[in-house]
Amino acid sequence: DPEWHTLDAHEVEQVQATWKAVSHDEVEILYTVFKAHPDIMAKFPKFAGKDLEAIKDTADFAVHASRIIGFFGEYVTLLGSSGNQAAIRTLLHDLGVFHKTRGITKAQFGEFRETMTAYLKGHNKWNADISHSWDDAFDKAFSVIFEVLES
């Protein structure tokens, strides 16, 4: 599995530090993703066809944002230990299965990645080294998720 590797300590530190800076921005992150990619929002039965501006400040939106972005935070937290690799793989596999049943595409995961990276860049000091660390973190996650989507 060429993409499956344990990030080194430096990469983990960078990913976790930059994540920490935005980890409580759940609503804003999900809003940013939906605003940039209405096709992703359309996959959420609770939100499909609704006005994003009207739902952004609702409890339903906050709960969903907390779940989605919280999952991502769990992944980032688990990155720090080689003993967590099986748990990470299981978490990502289950995410892939869930999203496959909802018809989520690799392209939509790519859109999420693009928007999340832009959000992270906008809320952190950013450089090529941090960018590389996040690329590795996304590649690791997507290697498992895409394996499921393609099965």
Curated annotation (Swiss-Prot):
GO terms for molecular function: heme binding; metal ion binding; oxygen binding; oxygen carrier activity. InterPro entries: Erythrocruorin, Globin, Globin-like_sf, Globin/Proto, Mb-like_M. Transmembrane segments: none annotated. Coiled coil: none annotated. Heme b binds at H64, H99. GO terms for cellular component: extracellular region; hemoglobin complex. PROSITE patterns: GLOBIN. CDD domains: Mb-like. It comes from the Eukaryota. SUPFAM superfamilies: Globin-like. Keywords: Heme, Iron, Metal-binding, Oxygen transport, Transport. Belongs to the globin family. Homodimer. This is Globin CTT-X. It comes from Chironomus thummi thummi. The lineage of its organism: Eukaryota, Metazoa, Ecdysozoa, Arthropoda, Hexapoda. The gene is CTT-10.
